[in-house]
Amino acid sequence: MTRDLTITAVHLTPILVADPPLLNTQGVHQPYTPRLIVEVETADGVTGVGETYGDAKYLELARPFAAKLVGRQVSDLNGLFTLADEVAVDSSRVFGQVDVGGLRGVQTADKLRLSVVSGFEVACLDALGKALGLPVHALLGGKVRDAVEYSAYLFYKWADHPEGVASEKDDWGAAVDPAGVVAQARAFTERYGFTSFKLKGGVFPPEEEIAAVKALAEAFPGHPLRLDPNGAWSVETSLKVAAELGDVLEYLEDPALGTPAMAEVAAKTGVPLATNMCVTTFAEIQEAFTKGAVQVVLSDHHYWGGLRNTQQLAAVCRTFGVGVSMHSNTHLGISLAAMTHVAATVPDLHHACDSHYPWQSEDVLTERLAFDGGKVAVSDAPGLGVALDRERLAFLHRRWLDDDGTLRDRDDAAAMRVADPEWVTPSVPRW
């Protein structure tokens, strides 16, 4: 039977989801963070779902982009990029701007468009898979593994958000010293079975973070460890940390900011360097690889424009002998399912992927994805293998509607100023 894959409707639902007080070099996570849920409906009544960033700058592009999709085929994945190029980007969103957290370098119109396209591409793949009775990984060429390994994503963390700030309670407790970090790692292991650990650094002086990693190495001997200060260190400091931790680190992630600084660090240490900051588009690959600045690229389908571009990135990395794994920002189950499907198709995935998912107490799915032994099983159900919980989606959307605009754009520095009114985003290198 021929299926009618014509897109008849696209629904965009911005939401606010609870986020714990996780610390980074920019500040602290807000009590709620914005996400955008994308739904694509076909003439046959099939609905596909996707997820991406929900900040205003992405919504401004997603709305006109969604209108252009109606009447097109859900299978026209290449056409998504052509359509995205037709959507104008407000120059104030990109001129001289650095994205929140500085995680992608200088913001560009193309980077904004790719993040929007990623959510729609996943939704189209989900719908196409459901229509054909095939899982997304089959549409991507087939899986090479039945489960994808993830690492425990450790953060320095306050016990609660500042007093007087509306927020959801969590049971993780505080982690502001080596003992707290180790306790957090043990909790991750007990709950989810993780066997590798990543610590978000750039929060405290390097000596304190070195002590935390050494404490992890003592508590979990032989387990892969990573440290990520988000470019907060100078080249000199990066080299000192690498010398101190070289015998326990799997890799050091973005110790210094930018490709030239990373290349200088890489030239003077044997510790592999990973990045999700200086290689976030195809245009940034040549300089980084030519200069030997990175040994592992942490892909993120929200950055790169979707799952198929993620596969292309993995192929380029394989060609140049550069490792590949996956970066994570705050996300829900739709994105974790998408990550798992594409990760299952990448042959040379030699490092556990990152995921914030354990930190998110809320979701929009009828059933949360589960970690078993630190891994997520690859679904063989049609599409992504997930289903929306309409009541939860409506609840989280209502929270977004009720917000006065304060939380509709992620701003870790603004969240920190609630606790410390004198806080300013630190200049880099911070140490």
UniProtKB/Swiss-Prot annotation:
Pathway(s) per entry: Carbohydrate acid metabolism; D-glucarate degradation; 2,5-dioxopentanoate from D-glucarate: step 1/2
Organism superkingdom: Bacteria
Signal peptide (UniProt feature, chain positions): none
Amino-acid positions noted as binding substrate in the UniProt annotation, renumbered to this chain: 29, 108, 153, 198, 228-230, 276, 327-329, 356, 410
SUPFAM superfamilies noted in UniProt: Enolase C-terminal domain-like (SSF51604), Enolase N-terminal domain-like (SSF54826)
Active site: 200, 327
Catalytic activity, reaction form: D-glucarate = 5-dehydro-4-deoxy-D-glucarate + H2O
UniProt binding sites for Mg(2+): 228, 276
Entry EC number(s): 4.2.1.40
GO BP, sorted A to Z: D-glucarate catabolic process
Cofactor(s) the protein requires to work: Mg(2+)
Keyword Lyase: yes
Annotated Pfam families: MR_MLE_C, MR_MLE_N
Keyword entries, A-Z: Lyase, Magnesium, Metal-binding
Molecular functions (GO terms): glucarate dehydratase activity; metal ion binding
Enzyme class, spelled out: lyase
Similarity annotation: Belongs to the mandelate racemase/muconate lactonizing enzyme family. GlucD subfamily.
Function, as annotated: Catalyzes the dehydration of glucarate to 5-keto-4-deoxy-D-glucarate (5-kdGluc).
Protein name in the entry: Probable glucarate dehydratase
